[in-house]
Amino acid sequence: MQETISKVRNSKPSSSNFFTFIQPILPIACVFFVICLVLILNRYFSFYASFDQGIFNQVFWNNIHGRFFQSSLSSSLSTNVVHANEIPTVYYHRLGQHFTPALLLWAPIYALFPNAATLAVLLVTLITAGGLMLYVLARQYLEPRLAVMITGSYYAANAVIGPTLCNFHDISQIPLFIFTLLLAMEKRWWWLFWLMAGLTVIVREDAGVSLFGVGVYMVLSKRFPRNGLAVCIFSFGYMLLLTNLIMPLFSDDISKRFMLERFGQYVDGEEATTLDVIWGILSNPVRLIVELVTPVGRTIRYLLGQLLPFAFIPAIAPASWSIAGFPLLKLLLGKGDSVLAINIRYAL
């Protein structure tokens, strides 16, 4: 068995034969890309795009014109408008709601094709590329047939198809970044690992939760304990610094609206910081347990939806729980109908 794994790991693709290396998964990836692209473009051109598509299109448009992350549509959702009944402003910076600097990576593409449909193409491309990176990652230890089965399960999962067929969202970058980060970890390419770690945390203000899970795995597996501890400190510290000091510079939305809408059951008052929410969760373990399992029916269906495409193998794999456990915990502890919806972006 060890000899087989060694042979697989030593069959490293070079730039010249990379296409040959990923060729077994290309038919499935191409089918996924084409079908999803046709469906999402039909959705957009049939005028079924939602408000979020307009927000991201406006943000991209303003970014390429030097008005970075300004959005009047986002302003209409701000606490100043929702709670204080103020008029939306055109110069409102969305970074107070969601801190998403990683979107600047794709601004040159949007500058070439400045249209909301470009974002639909970008969405499908990013999630498809995430699957290809998953295949390359799986091939580090598995033969092509098993790697194809795992990646095919990714492309067939409800938690992937649903978010791919909705409007553009920033979480679509996460699979590509995280799978690349894990590949870099396996290859000991630490420069790429830390680059992906940096890109991951700037996807969204809560993306550091996924990175924190990777750090926990690195520590508990005893493979890279020092790097893992550094990842945990970096991701957790970044989220605390960002949500408590940086985002409030742009607006009060994180404390007066978003934290309360998602985790208001753990705190009292009309505003709360991430530190307040964390303390509220840890200081009441009974409520923590209740929130984890209720509503029971929806929680079970959500877990089944996540595990079924992978034949429930992640459920018995400690590594899966250490990496995915913290993002899952964030969803289970939240409130609202969207947190346990398997077919929208949060499931990805």
Model-derived features: positions:
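Start-transfer (signal-anchor) and selected internal transmembrane alpha helices
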Residues: 1-38, 223-231
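Membrane-lumen/periplasm interface segments of specific transmembrane helices
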Residues: 36-38, 47, 52-55, 224-326
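Extracytosolic helix-loop segments that constitute the early lumenal/periplasmic catalytic or substrate-binding loops
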Residues: 55-91, 101
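Juxtamembrane segments of multi-pass membrane glycosylation machinery
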Residues: 88-122, 144, 286-300
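Transmembrane-helix motifs of polytopic, lipid-linked glycan transferases
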Residues: 108, 117, 121-141, 180
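Transmembrane-helix signature of polytopic, membrane-embedded enzymes
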Residues: 128-159, 175-176, 192
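Membrane-interface transmembrane helices that cradle and orient dolichyl/undecaprenyl
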Residues: 141-142, 170-173, 178-192, 218-222
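Short acidic/glycine- and proline-prone juxtamembrane loop motifs at membrane-interface regions
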Residues: 163-171
